[in-house]
From Swiss-Prot:
<keyword id="KW-0436">Ligase</keyword>
<dbReference type="GO" id="GO:0005737">
    <property type="term" value="C:cytoplasm"/>
</dbReference>
<dbReference type="GO" id="GO:0071555">
    <property type="term" value="P:cell wall organization"/>
</dbReference>
<comment type="function">
    <text>Cell wall formation.</text>
</comment>
<dbReference type="InterPro" id="IPR011095">
    <property type="entry name" value="Dala_Dala_lig_C"/>
</dbReference>
<keyword id="KW-0133">Cell shape</keyword>
<keyword id="KW-0460">Magnesium</keyword>
<keyword id="KW-0573">Peptidoglycan synthesis</keyword>
<keyword id="KW-0963">Cytoplasm</keyword>
<dbReference type="GO" id="GO:0046872">
    <property type="term" value="F:metal ion binding"/>
</dbReference>
<feature type="binding site">
    <location>
        <position position="269"/>
    </location>
    <ligand>
        <name>Mg(2+) 2</name>
    </ligand>
</feature>
<keyword id="KW-0479">Metal-binding</keyword>
<feature type="binding site">
    <location>
        <position position="254"/>
    </location>
    <ligand>
        <name>Mg(2+) 1</name>
    </ligand>
</feature>
<dbReference type="GO" id="GO:0009252">
    <property type="term" value="P:peptidoglycan biosynthetic process"/>
</dbReference>
<dbReference type="Pfam" id="PF07478">
    <property type="entry name" value="Dala_Dala_lig_C"/>
</dbReference>
<feature type="binding site">
    <location>
        <position position="267"/>
    </location>
    <ligand>
        <name>Mg(2+) 2</name>
    </ligand>
</feature>
<dbReference type="GO" id="GO:0005524">
    <property type="term" value="F:ATP binding"/>
</dbReference>
């Protein structure tokens, strides 16, 4: 929308999810960048009075810097659609699909995109190796959480019960996936084009919450250490996953690239982190020569509504 520069912008941050602290850091960085680029922006710590706050402050556009439940799952997007406030990132449906790991995996399978074999369980259902079509090792995760919250790698049968209990602590539905061994590669998307792919080598067993948000807990390699043809394939698969869910403007797609050269999609992050340690800003800077402030400006200028009214 061409008149975004003249509007008062709310940077939506914090919120009610398990990723609240990360969101506060993302929001603070985004708000500072918007002000530095000359926008009239204020930070809003999202609570249940959000509609009143947006109306009272005369907000004309929103930069969504929320992560996890209520912010990344289509809830806030639906509210902003009802209030006719243009917002950044994907719309209601794409946000909900990306946040729900079962439905996103089904969309990937339908689009011919590789994703790890999986089984879905609801609270109260028995989870045992005999119920699975694959063996150890495996991954147990909540259906709807981000930042690797509630995820476990299970290498021995004795670890399964604790992993299932942890995942159900965060959701009423869980996925049990076949463990795929490979390089952890993340593709950054902006304006519906891939900017590049970065490789992550975690000091922990996998790229978990601690490794994502603690300085020094992971090494980053840009571009990802893949031969040229495989690197291009990773970019293609990342963009295909973005499109398979109907995402808008920007996202970060997490992949595993196997020694056999297969690219498995883990998930699509419709509202990737925007902190000093976050991967999308690093990919933008190194892959598209786009400093953080310019990245934030590009994103806010893409703010829009999915439902157009006359």
């Amino acid at each position: 929308m061409n008149d975004i520069r003249s509007r008062k912008i709310a940077v939506l941050m914090g919120g009610l999810s398990a990723e609240r602290e990360v969101s506060l850091a993302s929001g603070a960085a985004v708000c500072q960048a918007l002000v530095a680029r000359g926008f009239d922006a204020l930070s809003v710590d999202v609570a249940r009075d959000l509609p009143l706050v947006l109306s009272r402050e005369g907000i004309g556009a929103a930069f969504i810097a929320l992560h996890g439940r209520y912010g990344e799952d289509g809830c806030v997007q639906g509210l902003l659609e009802l209030m006719a406030i243009p917002y950044t990132g994907s719309g209601v449906l794409a946000s909900a699909l990306a946040m729900h790991k079962l439905y996103s995996k089904q969309a990937f399978v339908s689009a011919g995109i590789l994703t790890a074999p999986f089984h879905h369980f609801r609270r109260g259902e028995r989870v045992s190796l005999s119920h699975l079509s694959f063996g150890l090792p495996l991954v147990v995760k909540p259906v709807q959480e981000g930042s690797s919250v509630g995820i476990s790698i299970v290498k021995e049968e004795s670890q399964l019960a604790a992993a299932v209990k942890l995942a159900f602590r965060h959701d009423d539905e869980i996925l049990v996936e076949q463990f795929i061994k490979g390089q952890e590669v993340q593709v950054g998307i902006l304006d519906d084009r891939p900017m590049g792919a970065i490789e992550i080598v975690s000091r922990n067993e996998f790229y978990d919450f601690e490794a994502k948000y603690t300085d020094g807990m992971a090494e980053h390699f840009f571009p990802a250490r893949l031969e040229k043809g495989l690197y291009e394939e990773a970019l293609r698969v990342g963009l295909a996953a973005h499109h398979a869910l109907g995402c808008r403007c920007y996202s970060r797609v997490d992949l595993l690239v196997t020694p056999a050269g297969e690219c498995y999609v883990l998930e699509v992050n419709t509202l990737p982190g925007m902190t000093a340690l976050s991967l999308l800003p690093e990919i933008a800077a190194k892959g598209a020569d786009l400093p953080f402030e310019e990245l934030v400006e590009r994103i806010i200028l893409s703010a829009d509504l999915s439902v157009k009214t006359g």
